[in-house]
């Protein structure tokens, strides 16, 4: 991503691969405000905004997080309820989305695509396995009156048709014609006050399957993308450390030392509190934005992920010990990575009561690590 520093623009390469895309945009037409366009990050709201389409929280395993359901409550402000709409057969980047136009839905924090599998189950699929046939959906304004005729392509960015917060959208799978709906809750779930309903595809569905769309704020969608790249990198790092502990030869272990080091520095800066000399209103706005970032990261399980990284590195008593197992380069970076992990942990909970409360149960565990390792002394407190 891009950031400003010392009056110039910098590319921070640690968050994600440094790939750039060139997108054609029609300069002869305008994009209507408040209408859906390709590439938007949004939430799919059901039932007068009481529920939204989402996946299980970060505390669940990877396989369970492939399932999709409708959930009410605070999830409507969590990153795991964000989706990116990617149009198929793009003429102009960011053009208006029409009724019946094929698109794919990519879940922001996992990077996986909503897919209808051969057995008619609805799951998130890895990018590499997400073929167009299984992942192509479209919006319909009604289940009865389908626009099945061939529509003439409109020059430029197209006509605005689907309005945020206003248009009622039914989601149809392009290849099978099935509709996105929900599995009716059983009596036991109703009695227990369950707030989740499994999302499924059906040839009829329910009368109230219509969804309204809510566009994500730029800061929110940016943070969600940072979460995705960070989770991917840290999990890769943990898998590498686990492989080392099983005494696999270091030459066969994928241990992204440099990427983790750079990412940690970027993240520490990302959560740095605003300068004290700022005007009061500007400072308060930045503090609110910082707290929102902290909350989004915590809700996706990032505090626990940082603790897992610390726990794996604490298996080694010194840089020399780590170097014996992982190699000279890794040994030289052991101390700085461990210190940066403690610093990031502090940045994630600093000034945030909710995150401090969530972390409090791990405090004794952390202090025992701090006391044992001189490399990390003083970094948290």
Residue ranges and their predicted role:
Residues 3, 51, 111-115, 121-125, ...:
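Elongated alpha-helical scaffolds that mediate protein-protein interactions in large eukaryotic proteins
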Residues 1-239, 335:
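Lectin-like carbohydrate-binding module/patch detector with strong preference for beta-trefoil
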């Amino acid at each position: 991503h891009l950031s400003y520093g010392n009056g110039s623009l910098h590319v921070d390469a640690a968050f994600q691969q440094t790939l750039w895309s060139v997108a054609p945009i029609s300069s002869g037409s305008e994009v209507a405000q408040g209408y859906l366009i390709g590439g938007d990050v949004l939430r799919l709201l059901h039932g007068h905004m009481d529920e939204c389409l989402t996946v299980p929280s970060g505390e669940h395993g990877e396989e369970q997080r492939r399932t999709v359901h409708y959930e009410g409550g605070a999830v409507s402000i969590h990153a795991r309820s964000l989706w990116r709409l990617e149009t198929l057969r793009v003429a102009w980047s960011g053009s208006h989305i029409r009724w019946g136009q094929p698109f794919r839905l990519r879940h922001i924090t996992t990077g996986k695509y909503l897919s209808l599998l051969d057995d008619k189950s609805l799951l998130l699929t890895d990018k590499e396995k997400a073929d167009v046939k299984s992942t192509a959906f479209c919006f319909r304004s009604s289940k009865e009156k389908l626009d099945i005729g061939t529509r003439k392509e409109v020059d430029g960015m197209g006509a605005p048709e689907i309005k945020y917060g206003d248009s009622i959208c039914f989601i149809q799978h392009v290849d099978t014609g099935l509709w996105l709906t929900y599995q009716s809750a059983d009596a036991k779930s109703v009695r227990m006050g369950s707030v989740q309903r499994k999302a499924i595809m059906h040839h009829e569905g329910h009368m109230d399957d219509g969804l309204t769309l809510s566009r994500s704020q730029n800061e929110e969608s940016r943070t969600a993308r940072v979460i995705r790249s960070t989770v991917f990198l840290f999990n890769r790092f943990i898998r590498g450390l686990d492989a080392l502990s099983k005494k696999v030869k270091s030459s066969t272990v994928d241990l992204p030392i440099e990427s983790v080091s750079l990412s940690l520095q970027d993240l520490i800066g990302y959560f740095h509190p605003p300068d004290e000399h700022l005007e009061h209103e500007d400072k308060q706005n930045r503090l609110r934005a910082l707290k929102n970032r902290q909350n989004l990261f915590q809700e996706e399980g990032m505090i626990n992920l940082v603790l897992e990284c610390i726990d794996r590195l604490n298996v080694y008593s010194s840089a020399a010990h780590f170097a014996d197992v992982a190699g000279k380069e890794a040994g030289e970076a052991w101390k700085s990575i461990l210190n940066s992990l403690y610093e990031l942990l502090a940045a994630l909970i600093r000034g945030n009561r909710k995150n401090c409360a969530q972390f409090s149960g791990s405090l004794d565990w952390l202090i025992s690590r701090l006391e044992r390792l001189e490399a990390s002394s003083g970094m948290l407190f």
